[in-house]
C-alpha cells in the first residue's frame, strides 16, 4: 500500500485542503495555466450570464491535484451563484442526491467530486434532473408505491473525475461542456509558487520558485505542499528566505529529486529496469515486484512518468524509456549483466 504521507502524493490531505481554501484563486483572471480551458470558460460563462441561464453541465477530468475543485468554485464565483459540494462515494442512496437537488436555488451549482464512483441507482436519478430539471422519486413501498415528479430549478451540475473512462456513456453524454486539465508547465507552476508564497508570508525569489516548481510534477497541489516544507527548512536554515540553493537543499533532504521523483517513482522505474531488463512487463508483475496495488500504480504513479517520457504503456506491457536509463545513469548493457 502506498505511504499515506508520500510528499508528492497528488491526493489532498486535510492540511492541503485547509491551505488550498485560503490560497486558491477566486476568479478566472487569477487562474494560472490551463489556457485552453480558461479561454473557453471566458466565453461560456458570460454567454450563460447574458442569457440569464445556468451554465451547461460541466465535466472536468484529469489527474489529481490539478485544480478541478478550484475551477468549479471559480465557475460559481464568476456566475455569482451558490455551489454545493459533495462526492460520489458520499451519495449512497437516491434520497441523498434528492435532498441536495431539492435544496438548490435557480442557477445554483451542484459539484460532485469523484463522480465516476456514483452508484447506478443514484446515477439514474441524475438523468432526468440534468435533462429536464425534474426529479423522479418513489413514494411508499410495495404495491402501494408510486412515482411522482418534482420540478427542479434550473441548475448546473459540475462533475470532477480522475477517470473519465470509468463514466457510463449515458452520464458522460449529458455534459454539455467537457474540460480536460493537463499537467502544468514549470513557468506556470513558478507563478503559482510565487503567488502561494505571498499568501504564506514567505520571501522567495524567482530562482527559488522555479526550483520548487520543477520538482512539483506539473501539479499545483504538490507545488504548494513542497513550498510549505521548504518554508519550514528556510525558517531554520536561512532566516525565512528562499533562493535556489535553499529550495534545492530542502527538497534534496526530502528525497524529491530534480525530476520530482520520490522513492516510489524510483522504485517503480528501477524494478522495470533491474528486474525486467527494461520491459515490456505486465502491470501485475510490476505491482508484485514493488509491493503496490495496480490501481495505485496506474492512477497515481504512472501518469506523470508517462507524460514526462520515462515510461511507456504498450500492448505488451510497461517499458522504461531511454530517458529513464539516462536519469539513473544506467546503460541498457548494464541491465543485461
Curated annotation (Swiss-Prot):
Q: Which domain of life is it from?
A: Bacteria
Keyword hit for Secreted: no
**What GO cellular component is one of the record's annotations?**
Holliday junction resolvase complex
The question of whether S-adenosyl-L-methionine is a record keyword is answered with no
Q: Where is this region: Large ATPase domain (RuvB-L)?
A: 4-184
Q: Which GO terms describe its molecular function?
A: ATP binding; ATP hydrolysis activity; four-way junction DNA binding; four-way junction helicase activity
Q: Where is it chiefly localized?
A: cytoplasm
Binding locations of DNA: 294, 313, 318
Biological process terms in GO annotation:
DNA recombination; DNA repair
**Region ranges (Head domain (RuvB-H)):** 258-337
User: Per the record, what are the reactions this protein catalyses?
Assistant: ATP + H2O = ADP + phosphate + H(+)
Return the annotated region ranges for Small ATPAse domain (RuvB-S).
185-255
* Positions annotated to bind ATP: 23-24, 65, 68-70, 131-133, 174, 184, 221
Q: What does the entry list as the binding residues for Mg(2+)? A: 69
Localisation per UniProt entry: Cytoplasm
Q: What is its EC number?
A: 3.6.4.-
Print the keywords alphabetically.
ATP-binding, Cytoplasm, DNA damage, DNA recombination, DNA repair, DNA-binding, Hydrolase, Nucleotide-binding
Return the domain comment text from this UniProt entry.
Answer: Has 3 domains, the large (RuvB-L) and small ATPase (RuvB-S) domains and the C-terminal head (RuvB-H) domain. The head domain binds DNA, while the ATPase domains jointly bind ATP, ADP or are empty depending on the state of the subunit in the translocation cycle. During a single DNA translocation step the structure of each domain remains the same, but their relative positions change.
Outline what the protein does.
The RuvA-RuvB-RuvC complex processes Holliday junction (HJ) DNA during genetic recombination and DNA repair, while the RuvA-RuvB complex plays an important role in the rescue of blocked DNA replication forks via replication fork reversal (RFR). RuvA specifically binds to HJ cruciform DNA, conferring on it an open structure. The RuvB hexamer acts as an ATP-dependent pump, pulling dsDNA into and through the RuvAB complex. RuvB forms 2 homohexamers on either side of HJ DNA bound by 1 or 2 RuvA tetramers; 4 subunits per hexamer contact DNA at a time.
Q: How does it assemble?
A: Homohexamer. Forms an RuvA(8)-RuvB(12)-Holliday junction (HJ) complex. HJ DNA is sandwiched between 2 RuvA tetramers; dsDNA enters through RuvA and exits via RuvB. An RuvB hexamer assembles on each DNA strand where it exits the tetramer. Each RuvB hexamer is contacted by two RuvA subunits (via domain III) on 2 adjacent RuvB subunits; this complex drives branch migration. In the full resolvosome a probable DNA-RuvA(4)-RuvB(12)-RuvC(2) complex forms which resolves the HJ.
Name-wise, this protein is Holliday junction branch migration complex subunit RuvB
Biological source species: Colwellia psychrerythraea (strain 34H / ATCC BAA-681)
Q: Which gene encodes it?
A: ruvB
Amino acid at each position: 500500500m502506498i505511504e499515506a504521507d508520500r510528499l508528492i502524493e497528488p491526493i489532498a490531505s486535510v492540511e492541503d485542503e485547509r491551505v488550498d481554501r485560503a490560497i486558491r484563486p477566486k476568479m478566472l483572471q487569477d487562474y494560472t495555466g490551463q489556457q485552453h480551458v480558461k479561454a473557453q470558460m471566458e466565453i461560456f460563462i458570460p454567454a450563460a450570464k447574458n442569457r440569464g441561464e445556468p451554465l451547461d453541465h460541466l465535466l472536468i477530468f484529469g489527474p489529481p491535484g490539478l485544480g478541478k475543485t478550484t475551477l468549479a468554485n471559480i465557475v460559481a464565483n464568476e456566475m455569482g451563484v451558490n455551489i454545493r459540494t459533495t462526492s460520489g462515494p458520499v451519495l449512497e442512496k437516491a434520497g441523498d442526491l434528492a435532498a441536495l437537488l431539492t435544496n438548490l436555488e435557480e442557477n445554483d451549482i451542484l459539484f460532485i467530486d469523484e463522480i465516476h464512483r456514483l452508484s447506478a441507482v443514484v446515477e439514474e436519478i441524475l438523468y432526468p434532473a440534468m435533462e429536464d430539471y425534474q426529479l423522479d422519486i418513489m413514494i411508499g413501498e410495495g404495491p402501494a408505491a408510486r412515482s411522482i415528479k418534482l420540478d427542479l430549478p434550473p441548475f448546473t451540475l459540475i462533475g470532477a473525475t480522475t477517470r473519465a473512462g470509468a463514466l457510463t456513456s449515458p452520464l458522460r453524454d449529458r455534459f454539455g461542456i467537457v474540460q480536460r486539465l493537463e499537467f502544468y508547465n514549470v513557468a506556470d507552476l513558478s507563478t503559482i509558487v510565487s503567488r502561494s508564497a505571498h499568501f504564506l508570508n514567505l520571501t522567495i525569489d524567482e530562482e527559488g520558485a522555479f526550483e520548487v516548481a520543477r520538482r512539483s510534477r506539473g501539479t499545483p497541489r504538490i507545488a504548494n505542499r513542497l513550498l510549505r516544507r521548504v518554508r519550514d527548512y528556510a525558517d531554520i536554515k536561512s532566516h525565512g528566505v528562499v533562493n535556489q540553493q535553499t529550495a534545492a537543499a530542502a527538497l534534496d533532504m526530502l528525497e524529491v529529486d530534480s525530476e520530482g521523483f520520490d522513492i516510489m517513482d524510483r522504485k517503480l522505474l528501477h524494478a522495470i529496469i533491474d528486474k525486467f531488463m527494461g520491459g515490456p512487463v505486465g502491470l501485475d508483475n510490476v505491482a508484485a515486484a514493488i509491493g503496490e496495488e495496480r490501481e495505485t500504480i496506474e492512477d497515481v504513479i504512472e501518469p506523470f512518468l508517462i507524460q514526462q517520457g520515462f515510461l511507456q504503456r504498450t500492448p505488451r506491457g510497461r517499458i522504461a524509456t531511454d530517458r529513464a536509463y539516462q536519469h539513473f545513469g544506467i546503460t541498457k548493457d548494464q541491465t543485461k549483466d
